[in-house]
Regions:
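N-terminal amphipathic alpha-helix/helix-capping segment at the start of soluble metabolic enzymes
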Residues: 1-23, 70, 75
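General structural feature for long, well-ordered alpha-helical segments within catalytic domains
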Residues: 7, 28-35, 43-46, 65-69, ...
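Hydrophobic faces of well-ordered beta-strands that scaffold small-molecule active sites
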Residues: 10-15, 47-49, 80-87, 115-118
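Active-site mouth loops of central-metabolism enzymes
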Residues: 14-34, 86-102, 118-124
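Glycine-rich, proline-tolerant flexible connector loops at the mouths of alpha/beta enzymes
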Residues: 23, 45-70, 88-94, 120-127
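Catalytic domains of carbohydrate-active enzymes, especially glycoside hydrolases
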Residues: 31-53, 108-116
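N-terminal active-site wall of soluble small-molecule enzyme domains
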Residues: 61-72, 76-86, 92-112
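Conserved small/polar residues in nucleotide/adenosyl-binding loops
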Residues: 128-132
């Protein structure tokens, strides 16, 4: 019996995690835009470019609209899926939100360009996993 070979799918995190870890999420949207075309040609399955601390840092420190950032990234990545890191019931914040708020935020994230949502929840709530099918 032949073993089915599945392709390796690579997800790149440089536009979210690299500057989050190295320079406290201070990379502006304008600094990201020049490399998008080259990244889009690499053949990544997805680029994780939103979520985690990017939303807060965009507003609080960079004085940017995080939704506009997402739309600009979506416009630039023609062939690559966009992924976000989502804090479960906390969305992208630091406290839990009501289920309807979480659902609305997920809907708006998808409407603005997100294809894949990677969920991490600090206490691994079963309810978050069950509700993640929004």
């Amino acid at each position: 019996m032949a073993v089915e070979k599945k392709p390796v799918k690579i997800m790149e995190t440089v536009l979210r995690d690299a500057h989050q870890s190295l320079i406290a999420t201070r990379m502006t949207t304008e600094q990201m835009l020049p490399i998008i075309d080259k990244m889009d040609k690499v053949g990544y399955h997805a680029v994780e470019c939103w979520g985690g601390a990017t939303f807060d840092a965009s507003l609080r420190f960079l004085h940017e609209d995080p939704w506009m950032r997402l739309r600009k990234l979506r416009d630039g990545f023609k062939n690559t899926k966009l992924q976000m890191l989502f804090r479960g019931q906390n969305i992208l914040g630091y406290r839990p939100y009501a289920d309807d708020v979480v659902e609305y935020f997920v809907q708006k994230s998808i409407a603005n360009g997100i294809d894949i949502i990677s969920i991490f929840d600090c206490i691994d709530r079963k309810s978050t996993r069950l509700n993640s099918s929004h």
